[in-house]
Amino acid sequence: MCEQFREQADAVIDALYARIGEGSPQPRLAPTRRACELLGDPQRMHGIVHITGSNGKTSTARMIDSLLRAHGLRSGVMTSPHLNRLNERIVIDGEPISDEALVANYNDIEPFLVMVDTELAASDEPALTFFEALTVLAFACFADAPVDVAVLEVGMGGEWDSTNVANADVAVFTPIGMEHVEKLGPTLIDIARTKSGIIKPASRVVTSPQQAEVIEVLRGACELNEAPLSVLGRDIHLTAITPGVGGQLIDIEMHSGSYWGLAVPLLGTHQAENAAIAVAAVEQFLGGGEHRLEREVIEEGLAQSTSPGRLQVVRIQPTIIVDAAHNPHGAEALSRAVMSSFQFPSLVVVFGVLSDKDARGIVEALDPIADYFVVTQPHSERARPVEDLADTVTQLAGPDRTSWRGGLSDAIELAIEQAGPDGGVLITGSVAMVGEAMELLSEGEQ
């Protein structure tokens, strides 16, 4: 059955690629709007976060997606280009669209694509392009899921990009520079004006630091549309960036409040800036930028922007690994990754969870790789009490393989003693605890 869907999906992809390539976009919206109209305007069935810029769009989109999902929203993401397969461009619930869903939704929209192609031919206009058809397909997939919010990355520019048939609740601008001058215009101001077209009446706008002339263009578009503008470096502040192994810790200040010590599992100042505007964009989407969001949820969302099963080695002798797995599925992936990547004479797991997590399922997944558990609790009001959690772990792993400590620092110290210089320490179970551990270890407290 899977092979059958793969073959059908390949046929869909071939049909899309048979259209005018995305390197030759048509500066128009009417055909995409017409196709969406025939389908009942699926792009109006959910919230919209729209992202344009010259660099960092996909990273920012993925972070926003992770943050929205951490807040319990079902999200869809459209990005480009893809690495291996077109399915990657349409993401629902953090996963690329399945071949089955891709085929089903394409079959639903294909008659309407043909109808629009026929109308365009009658007017001596080119048929729907690859990207126009893909945009319509993405909207159909999101409506079919259905999602609560779609995060859309423009293909090129903004004003006449096919994704712009959607009306942004939040418009996000990553750094804008000189690009595609043959399509977007010969000057930075021209390019900024084209990109500013994603700003709609009553949109909320968040932007990375920009050159002065770009800020002026964005400010003018915001005034015209009565859209509030938040600028990183003016309204949003990265007050600290602390590099760490496999990532960095950032502090963000904005009108609603501050977020201290957020763990971003990506390297580079540009990724810290992307994370800051992603947090600001989600704040704007959920509460108009007036209400500070729960730190633990923000921390969880940023941590999930990494690749599934990613391991972060934060110290050697003994090797200390942190991983944000906080459900059984993630713990199973983590267990497999540890077994395939490391060969420790002994591995000690420092374990703590929030109260709403499946602790038993996580421990069962980690049990095959753990020689010893040190149970603790994250520094969070939502943490499961350490003694209660220790009872659960002891039932599963046995009293000879379980200890507990009330504070994470003490738990890590005990784990290091148990592991010995050649062993390994794995800190997992809670995103919040991983961030706390990164901060402790970066400060050299262990």
Region locations from a protein language model:
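Nucleotide phosphate-binding/pyrophosphate-handling subdomain across enzymes
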Residues: 45, 149-152, 161-172, 176-180, ...
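ATP-dependent carboxylate-amine ligase catalytic core
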Residues: 8, 36-44, 70-166, 182-184, ...
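Extended acidic/charged loop-beta regions that coordinate divalent cations
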Residues: 137-183, 216-261
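A glycine-rich beta-strand to alpha-helix segment
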Residues: 410-442
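Short functional linear segments
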Residues: 1-53, 60-73, 78-80, 117-125
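Short glycine/serine- and small hydrophobic-enriched flexible loop segments
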Residues: 140-143, 280-287, 439
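C-terminal helical cap/extension that packs against the catalytic core
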Residues: 211-229, 246-249, 319-322, 328, ...
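Beta-strand->loop->alpha-helix junctions that form or flank phosphate-binding loops
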Residues: 78-81, 208-209, 223-243, 264-269, ...
